[in-house]
UniProtKB/Swiss-Prot annotation:
<dbReference type="GO" id="GO:0003735">
    <property type="term" value="F:structural constituent of ribosome"/>
</dbReference>
<dbReference type="GO" id="GO:1990904">
    <property type="term" value="C:ribonucleoprotein complex"/>
</dbReference>
<dbReference type="GO" id="GO:0006412">
    <property type="term" value="P:translation"/>
</dbReference>
<protein>
    <recommendedName>
        <fullName>Small ribosomal subunit protein bS21</fullName>
    </recommendedName>
</protein>
<dbReference type="Pfam" id="PF01165">
    <property type="entry name" value="Ribosomal_S21"/>
</dbReference>
<keyword id="KW-0689">Ribosomal protein</keyword>
<feature type="compositionally biased region" description="Basic residues">
    <location>
        <begin position="43"/>
        <end position="60"/>
    </location>
</feature>
<comment type="similarity">
    <text>Belongs to the bacterial ribosomal protein bS21 family.</text>
</comment>
<dbReference type="InterPro" id="IPR001911">
    <property type="entry name" value="Ribosomal_bS21"/>
</dbReference>
<dbReference type="InterPro" id="IPR018278">
    <property type="entry name" value="Ribosomal_bS21_CS"/>
</dbReference>
<keyword id="KW-0687">Ribonucleoprotein</keyword>
<dbReference type="GO" id="GO:0005840">
    <property type="term" value="C:ribosome"/>
</dbReference>
<feature type="region of interest" description="Disordered">
    <location>
        <begin position="35"/>
        <end position="60"/>
    </location>
</feature>
<dbReference type="InterPro" id="IPR038380">
    <property type="entry name" value="Ribosomal_bS21_sf"/>
</dbReference>
């Protein structure tokens, strides 16, 4: 869990901006989206191989 303490003479907006940045860096939102619905292991493998195929074709 990301934790941000508001510093002296710091506006709430800048503290919120730091909190959002720390959450994005920690990958909190992407993890939540990934775990929103159950995904069968076979579907995970299929998505992973398709992503690798796309990356490989992008390089060429």
């Amino acid at each position: 869990m990301s934790e941000v303490k508001v510093r002296d003479n710091e506006s709430l907006e800048s503290a919120l901006k730091r909190f959002k940045r720390s959450c994005a860096k920690a990958g909190v939102l992407s993890e939540v989206r990934k775990r929103e619905h159950y995904e069968k292991p076979s579907v995970k493998r299929k998505k992973k191989s398709e992503a690798a195929r796309r990356r490989k074709s992008k390089v060429r």
